[in-house]
Amino acid sequence: MRLGIKEIEKIIPHRHPFLLVDYIEDMEPGVRAVGYKCVTFHEDFFRGHFPQEPVMPGVLTVEALAQVGAVAILSMEENKGKTAYFGGINKCRFRGKISPGDKVRLETKIIKVKGPMGIGEATASVDGKVVVKAELTFMIG
């Protein structure tokens, strides 16, 4: 199931400049979602991170992965209309950088949902190379 920006905005509350997912390419509610961020030189964060060698902050990549996971969790029938909050992060590793011109593949697999909590395994990659891996916890409210 492909979702454009307008469909994403119906599911999660994030808006520009903090909506970090351009589209969802594939999604199974409560199971997984794959989204993309097409990074341009005009992203606000590049003005200060770093002017001589622009690099997308790793924590923003983690946030983008969390947004993709939130789309998967909040698309479950019982969670529609709710909000997914960032509850925690474990086993996070930064393995590469993201630069202007990169198309970042963001995949979050939901490995557990119990009550108001969910856990996802998240991976960001550029050109098939993993740049970030993390386990994310979501609080659903």
Which positions does each model-derived feature cover?
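Beta-strand-rich interaction surfaces with strong enrichment in secreted/lumenal proteins
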Residues: 9, 52, 94-96
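Conserved positions in beta-strands of structured domains
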Residues: 22-25, 90, 95, 109-111
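Active-site helix/loop of acyl-thioester processing domains in fatty-acid/polyketide metabolism
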Residues: 24, 56-79
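HotDog/MaoC-like acyl-thioester-processing domains
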Residues: 13, 98-102, 109-141
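Short aromatic-glycine motifs in intrinsically disordered, low-complexity regions
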Residues: 5-15
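Hydrophobic core residues within well-ordered beta-strands of beta-rich domains
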Residues: 18-20, 104, 118
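Catalytic strand-loop segment that frames the active site of acyl-thioester-processing enzymes
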Residues: 16-56, 61
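Hydrophobic beta-strand-centered segment that forms part of the acyl-chain substrate-binding groove
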Residues: 1-2, 69-105, 131-139
